[in-house]
Amino acid sequence: MKIDIIISADDIVESRVRNKIAVIIDIFRATSVIITALDNGAREVIPYLTIEETLEYAKKLSRDNYILGGERKAVKIEGFDLSNSPLEYIKEKVEDKTVLMTTTNGTRALTKSMEAKRVFIGAMINGESVAKKLININDDVVIINAGTNGNFSMDDFICSGYIINRILDVNRNIELTDIAKTACMIYKENINILSYVREASHYSVMKSLGLNNDIDYCIKKSIIDIVPEYKDGKITCE
């Protein structure tokens, strides 16, 4: 197994994902939302790049069967049911529903990863389970950080390091690219995630919007066991 990291959605190129196992990470907050929604019983999550695409697909469904969720610049989209806060995706709202989702960074990373052999959804909240999944598959991995508006994101990067460290706890015989080694070392030096992500630009944006509870939730380690998979345009659990 060899592990690489792509630092933002803008840096995704086919040659780096083709025939590899991809893990998409956007801990603040798209992948945390997806994992939480499915863990709380959502039937599936379907990501879209644009608001228009999301609303167009919604026309094909019965209104009782879907939830519109997403954000632009970390703020809920007008007319949507839910924002991009994982704390909103409770069982009472999402159980047996299709979640139609569009976000600034996470959905871009997902839709640009289609050349991968398989695409999984990762975050701090399911990091241990992601590591176990990758160990069992035992194939080359690329961890794709959604980033922030095409730029490197500290929060996604340290989550990558967390997952890599969990893999190394089980199997030290893993080849890491230099950037994967760097993420691994950064996590080891910042096991208290909050003290590290406080320096991230995305943290500052969320803090300014009063999203403290979202921050606290998204940096929790391995509180959910599922590992959603993106396939044929939809995200589901096995």
Curated annotation (Swiss-Prot):
Keywords: Hydrolase, Magnesium
Catalytic activity field: (2R)-O-phospho-3-sulfolactate + H2O = (2R)-3-sulfolactate + phosphate
Keyword Magnesium part of the UniProt annotation: yes
A Pfam family recorded for this sequence: 2-ph_phosp
SUPFAM superfamilies: ComB-like
UniProt-listed Enzyme Commission number(s): 3.1.3.71
Superkingdom of origin organism: Bacteria
Cofactor entry: Mg(2+)
Molecular function per GO: 2-phosphosulfolactate phosphatase activity; magnesium ion binding; sulfopyruvate decarboxylase activity
Entries under InterPro entries matching the protein: ComB-like, ComB-like_sf
Keyword Magnesium found: yes
Family stated for the protein in its record: Belongs to the ComB family.
PANTHER family recorded: 2-PHOSPHOSULFOLACTATE PHOSPHATASE-RELATED
Protein known as: Probable 2-phosphosulfolactate phosphatase
Gene it is expressed from: comB
